[in-house]
Amino acid sequence: MSSSKKGSDRNQIRKSLRKLKKQIGELEKLESPDRLNNVKPIFIKRNIYLKKKLKKKVKDHGIFCSCSLDPGSSTLCGSDCNCGILLSSCSSSCKCSSECTNKPFQQRHIKKMKLVQTEKCGYGIVADEDINSGEFIIEYVGEVIDDKICEERLWKLNHKVETNFYLCQINWNMVIDATHKGNKSRYINHSCSPNTEMQKWIIDGETRIGIFATRFINKGEQLTYDYQFVQFGADQDCYCGAVCCRKKLGAKPCKTKNTTLEEAVKPVACKVTWKTPKLLNSEVRETNLDASGQAWNNHSQRKICCRDCIGAYYTAQMKVLTLVVDIFQVMYEDGVTEIIDMCREVWKVVTA
């Protein structure tokens, strides 16, 4: 075979390999960190629903805009767009046109990022380009499960002595589990002084979680957000290195403030280390109810906190529903109501 023929073949092979690498590059990079543990997470671009997909019609939300093109501008729906302010993408109900820019998830302009090995926090993600404050970085995706499946998975992982799994609570009874299926967002580490945040958006009636920059991020800088860590057992050491580091992942910020409705329904990302949960003191479950519920005559409603499967507490109003003890109707701060057998739940009365 002539040297020119061999050179041509080698060039063809290189082109084929480059094309193949481009096609599977994302999957290859995602799988690499867990090979030592014989775990290969599957790369996905969209959430996979293992529970019934609750998708409301766009018109039911009543969110739309009437943005018009400003003179000399080529784009619509900037920072003053009604939909964007309410964390909802523009839809067919809006009066804006195809120039609309308030569609961060649909347009899928995912920022360039790289997987790296950190000194103390395992693998992490660094920006591979400059990112401006407020820009969409990536969607947090995984398997969407309910509390029942979440609890079952936690127990299975506990039996396997597995500690690496990733949960993001969308709302009550809906959790994104990126343990086995996800994208690069599952490797973003925690920081007590993060440069990104999770936002819960309504996209064509579907609730989705996006990660957005909270400040300008330089190329090569590690991406972080506050896990709002929820765990079972002792606090875990934090190695974020921030000046305001809380030292423990389970610790709360030093400055306290009143929880707003917006904060109450904000998604909570949890990197959980499983340990046997401590039982609440018996006095917490003391409700002062007799068999007929007479103790509630003077005040039929009380403010309580209910704990979900990953240990996060949700504030709710509880009222007597029947004369059967421990059967109540609760309404959470996001307006969702639920009938609960309180003797099967972990809860406590809010006194403050």
UniProtKB/Swiss-Prot annotation:
Gene Ontology molecular function, alphabetical: histone H3K36 methyltransferase activity
Enzyme Commission code: 2.1.1.-
Domain annotation Post-SET: ranges: 234-250
SMART domains per UniProt: AWS, PostSET, SET
GO cellular component: chromatin; chromosome, centromeric region; nucleus
CDD domains linked to this entry: SET_ASHR3-like
Keyword RNA-binding assigned: no
Pfam families given in the database record: SET
Catalytic activity: L-lysyl-[histone] + S-adenosyl-L-methionine = N(6)-methyl-L-lysyl-[histone] + S-adenosyl-L-homocysteine + H(+)
Residue ranges of coiled coil: none
Locations listed in the record: Nucleus; Chromosome, Centromere
Entry's Gene Ontology BP terms: methylation; regulation of DNA-templated transcription
Top-level class of the enzyme under EC nomenclature: transferase
Main location: nucleus
Keywords on record: Centromere, Chromatin regulator, Chromosome, Methyltransferase, Nucleus, S-adenosyl-L-methionine, Transferase
Family: Belongs to the class V-like SAM-binding methyltransferase superfamily. Histone-lysine methyltransferase family. SET2 subfamily.
PANTHER family, A to Z: SET DOMAIN PROTEINS
Function: Histone methyltransferase.
Designated name of the protein: Putative histone-lysine N-methyltransferase ASHH4
